[in-house]
């Protein structure tokens, strides 16, 4: 189950042009976004650790997204 709130995901889909969005559609997208975010976060943590830091910085996130 996704930890991301459904309402903001619903708004994103509407912003993309949808007139109506089913709750299930918003849940599915939220789950996918959460999986992708977790993947990026894990890469960013590894980058921070490699640099000898415990703190994940924006640069780690940016590099993780690019890789």
Curated annotation (Swiss-Prot):
Keyword Protein biosynthesis set for record: no
Intracellular or extracellular location(s): Cytoplasm; Chromosome
Stretch list, region Interaction with DNA: 20-22, 54-57
InterPro entries in alphabetical order: Archaeal_histone_HMF, CBFA_NFYB_domain, Histone-fold, HmfB-like, TAF_TATA-bd_Histone-like_dom
Inducers of expression: After 17 hours growth at 85 degrees Celsius HTkB/HpkB is expressed about twice as abundantly as HTkA/HpkA (at protein level).
UniProt-listed SMART domains: TAF
Keywords, comma-separated and alphabetical: Chromosome, Cytoplasm, DNA-binding
Pfam families with a match to the protein in the record: CBFD_NFYB_HMF
Disruption phenotype: Cells can be transformed but grow about 75% as well as wild-type in liquid culture, some differences in transcription occur; double histone deletions (htkA and htkB) cannot be made.
Role description: Binds and compacts DNA (about 120 base pairs per nucleosome, corresponding to four histone dimers) to form nucleosome-like structures. Histones block elongating RNA polymerase (RNAP). HTkB/HpkB has higher DNA affinity than HTkA/HpkA and compacts DNA better than HTkA/HpkA. Participates in both transcription activation and repression in vivo.
Family: Belongs to the archaeal histone HMF family.
Note: In a chromatin histone fraction 83% of the protein is this histone. Cells have about 2.5 x 10(6) histone proteins per cell, enough to coat all DNA with a ratio of >1 histone dimer for 30 bp of DNA, cells are polyploid with 7-19 genomes per cell.
Protein name stated in the entry: Archaeal histone HTkB
Species per Swiss-Prot/TrEMBL record: Thermococcus kodakarensis (strain ATCC BAA-918 / JCM 12380 / KOD1)
């Amino acid at each position: 189950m996704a930890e991301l709130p459904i309402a903001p995901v619903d708004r994103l889909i509407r912003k993309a042009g949808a007139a109506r969005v089913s709750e299930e559609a918003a849940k599915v997208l939220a789950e996918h976004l959460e999986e992708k975010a977790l993947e990026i976060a894990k890469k960013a943590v590894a980058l921070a650790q490699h640099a000898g830091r415990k703190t994940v910085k924006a640069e780690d996130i940016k590099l993780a997204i690019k890789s």
